Amino acid sequence: MNTDAIESMVRDVLSRMNSLQGDAPAAAPAAGGTSRSAKVSDYPLANKHPEWVKTATNKTLDDFTLENVLSNKVTAQDMRITPETLRLQASIAKDAGRDRLAMNFERAAELTAVPDDRILEIYNALRPYRSTKEELLAIADDLENRYQAKICAAFVREAAGLYVERKKLKGDD
């Protein structure tokens, strides 16, 4: 595939994402979580509100010491960020007028519920000529229904539409 074509396609997707940003569904709040909001004045969270920052295994920033790492009290699993922390970062970005960055944090928050292996499968499926439109739409439905990842599902549906327009689906090459 020609690099100019790839660059053009990426620019088109980004342009459409920017134009749809106001229409994109907001990330669903975490089940049982709080919908705390943060402002620019709360940044950086680690300094101003360390009590707000917890890992997926409920560890706090104070738990991350060299001693705890060396004694295996802190593992790689403990390093995973939570959707709540990502949503706080998104609200800070929105407050700062950085809507595109906020959208990225919200998408990342949704993806914390998706297993790593599934994310890699989706990544590969989104590469040009790897999937049919139906396969991409099935991925979008899966993201929305199984993982409540509405923003990511909309992104995959948009990609499916662009791939139809640009003839980048499986069998088009």
Curated annotation (Swiss-Prot):
UniProt GO molecular function: cobalamin binding; propanediol dehydratase activity
Known pathway: Polyol metabolism; 1,2-propanediol degradation
Reaction(s) catalysed (UniProt annotation): propane-1,2-diol = propanal + H2O
EC annotation from Swiss-Prot or TrEMBL: 4.2.1.28
Known regulation of activity: Inhibited by glycerol.
Protein location: Bacterial microcompartment
GO biological process: propanediol catabolic process
Any one cellular-component term (Gene Ontology): propanediol degradation polyhedral organelle
Induction notes from the record: BMC production is induced by growth on 1,2-PD vitamin B12 medium. By either propanediol or glycerol.
One Pfam family this sequence matches: Dehydratase_SU
Observed effect of gene inactivation: A triple pduC-pduD-pduE deletion releases no acetaldehyde when grown on propanediol.
Cofactor: adenosylcob(III)alamin
SUPFAM superfamilies documented for this protein: Diol dehydratase, gamma subunit
Keywords linked to the UniProt accession: Bacterial microcompartment, Cobalamin, Cobalt, Lyase
Subunit structure, as described in the record: The propanediol dehydratase enzyme is a heterotrimeric complex composed of a large (PduC), a medium (PduD) and a small (PduE) subunit.
Miscellaneous comment in the UniProt entry for this protein: Bacterial microcompartments (BMC) 100-200 nm in cross section are formed during aerobic growth on minimal 1,2-PD-B12 or anaerobic growth on 1,2-PD-tetrathionate medium, but not during aerobic growth on glucose, anerobic growth on glucose or pyruvate-tetrathionate. BMCs can constitute up to 10% of total cell protein.
Family the entry assigns: Belongs to the diol/glycerol dehydratase small subunit family.
Function in brief: Part of the PduCDE complex that catalyzes the dehydration of 1,2-propanediol (1,2-PD) to propionaldehyde. Required for S.typhimurium growth on 1,2-PD as the sole carbon and energy source. Localized in the bacterial microcompartment (BMC) dedicated to 1,2-PD degradation.
NCBIfam families: PRK15443.1-2, PRK15443.1-3
Protein name (record): Propanediol dehydratase small subunit
Gene: pduE
